[in-house]
Amino acid sequence: QVRLRTGIEMDILSNSEQRFLDYKSIALQGQQFDEIIEKGTAIVDIGGGSIQISLFDKDTLVSTQNLKLGVLRLRESMNFLNASLSQYQNLIGEIVESQLSVYKKLYLKDRVIENLIIVDDYISRLIRHYYRKEGKGDITTREQIEEFMEKSRMKSTLELSRLLDMPEEDMPALYIS
């Protein structure tokens, strides 16, 4: 119908095409990207149904694995369990940790992940909005994210949505991410 009304041709991308374009845009960061992947780096693409982890070490792609831990899938699990937002952290932590422990044994082995590149709809928006506004740029530390998450636990979903300029209904998905 879009083509009939506007004359614009549209194609729908598959998951793999979308992820390829995401990775390509990350790689276009040039020298900064090349420097980052020299050390242990994981690109974590958080989708609705799954998370894809691509592991780089010494400038080489070591592995890519898909885990069924997407935001919508986990949110559905939380709804099934009638979990409140305050319970999300512990419940999701248990679910994610069980799958990540298998991933670590099979693929991570003795590698150390020094850099994490996140591709998603929620954490990326948080970093762009909150940290850029603070003059901190696109790169954040683990400590900064943990500090923000700790502060956000003290806020209502309405306060948090206003702070981040995001719809309040997106807050559960942000907690899951």
Each model region followed by its residue ranges:
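Active-site-adjacent helix-turn-beta-strand microarchitecture at beta-sheet edges
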Residues: 47-50
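Helical "lid/coupling" subdomains associated with nucleotide-phosphate turnover
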Residues: 1-40, 55-177
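Short glycine-aspartate micro-motif
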Residues: 41-45
